[in-house]
A protein has these predicted regions:
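A short aromatic-anchored loop/beta-hairpin motif
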Residues: 2-136, 141-197
Length: 197
């Protein structure tokens, strides 16, 4: 199975990694992306945008909603952790969600998923009428034109077609191993192999 969709473009394959996971290869042992699973929300000729989906931070939704003065009426959400989404705009909230809905500032990813940055979605979440499935992050990961493609050729990232099951039905610590299992690879053994290469 191909992990990347290719189109022929003047002798060079053009990759479209929208709705794919990026796994940080174990050679990245330091920095913000070490051990991360990143979901690519948009990838085109201008670059790529994704959010890290397996790195919760020490901030609950209840605390975040208090900080932005939005009541959170769904008590079961108040202890859910916000995630580190990436180093770009690290103070801004991003909501990856299903179903899409109609929001003021939304990037439609595919027929099921969207990434929303406007406050209206947070207000509806606070009222208990928000999307059924969601991951809320602070910040995102961004790549300039050609940067992600170059990093992939340098073996910085492994690409895997994304799964809503992994995004929304597994705890953060289970997402990376589950994504790797789609390829039949145990991430922990991959990490050990790098240490012995």
């Amino acid at each position: 199975m191909r992990a990347v969709t290719e189109r022929y473009n003047g002798g060079m394959p053009e990759f479209n990694l929208t709705h794919h996971f990026l796994v940080a290869m174990p050679t990245i042992q330091e920095g913000v992306f070490a051990g991360t699973l990143t979901y690519i929300c948009e990838h085109n000729e201008n670059g790529a945008l994704g959010i890290v989906v397996n790195r919760p931070i020490n901030l609950t939704l209840g605390e975040m909603f208090d900080q932005i003065n939005i009541p959170l009426r769904q008590s079961e959400l108040s202890n859910c952790l916000v995630h580190f989404g990436g180093p770009v705009q690290a103070e801004r909230g991003f909501v990856l969600h299903e179903p899409q809905g109609d929001w003021e500032s939304t990037l439609l990813i595919n027929a099921k998923l969207a990434l929303t940055t406007s406050k209206d979605i947070l207000e509806v979440i606070g009222e208990g009428r928000g999307p059924r499935n969601m991951v809320i992050t602070l910040g995102y990961a961004g790549w300039d034109q050609g940067q992600l493609e170059h990093e992939i050729t340098e073996n910085v990232w492994l690409t895997i077609p994304a799964s809503e099951h992994i995004l929304f039905e597994l705890p953060p610590e289970g997402r990376l191993p589950a994504a790797m299992s789609l390829l039949g690879v145990d991430y922990s053994s991959l990490v050990e192999d790098v240490g012995h290469a």
